[in-house]
Amino acid sequence: MTKPENYQEGVFSVAEDLADLWTGFCFEQGVAGCEILQEADGEQRLKCYLTEPQKLDEWIARFHSEYPQAIGKLELVEHRLCPNENWRLGWHDHFQPVEIGRTLLIAPVWYERELPENRQVIWLEPGQAFGTGTHVSTRLALEMLELVILQEAQVPPSLIDVGTGSGILGLAAARLGISKIIACDNDPVVLPEASHNFELNQQGQHFWGVVGMASVIDETAPLVISNMLLAELKSAVVDLARLTATGGTLICSGLLTEQEAPLATALAKYGLRICASTEAEGWSAFAFREAGRF
């Protein structure tokens, strides 16, 4: 994977009530990371890092179109292009190792200090794909994935990752013993990055990449996972249910906590019920199984 000639930084002033939803939206647009610069008087200043120049002012209009109920301050305060040689420097302070759950640890590829020996390390480098473990929805998805796998009497043989992004969820599954990861994404730029991250972690033999979303996959798996926003999850409900093998588990993250009911109602039509959930900072992840299997 080649590095971009420049990367872009955008700073937004966001009403505190919108901050989590806006951050999740930014990751869906392809930011490699976000950090809070300042919090005061009910507002946050958020800096976003991108590997390709974007028309950031258009994001705000798109956000309000997708979330008409989201009311509050949202302004682009500053944006600039930075030379690629500063890319890694800009990330050193922001993207630090983070422990997730009981066994996982996400670390940037350049990190040189000693890491805990009792953790399964997933090495990543910033890219255009969503998923570095820095956003709470990714962290919750990883925690739920770990919980489900560790509770099984036997490690499931395969997993389908819908909307794979950086491949971080599939990588975690491979680290936890799953031998076949089918990863799909409708952005063709993303799959080479996910494949690169699998190779970086010596897990390339476990990766099967598919361009497109859930509808293009014609097999099932005992474990299916998707970290997407509610609208995307709801549009994929039929296929998410279809891909989940009989007796299997579907994990969904990327939801605000109050969005549980719409997704649960949609999946209940296919016999899937919530069997586990986890929540942090206003976001939630859920595991679904057939009624009677929990």
Locate the predicted segments by residue:
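N-terminal auxiliary segments of SAM/dcSAM-dependent transferases
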Residues: 4-116
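Conserved beta-strand segments that form the floor/walls of ligand-binding pockets within enzyme
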Residues: 9, 13, 105, 123-125, ...
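SAM-dependent Rossmann-like transferase core, predominantly class I methyltransferases
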Residues: 85-153
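Conserved SAM/SAH cofactor-binding pocket of Class I
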Residues: 128, 132-217
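S-adenosylmethionine
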Residues: 186-294
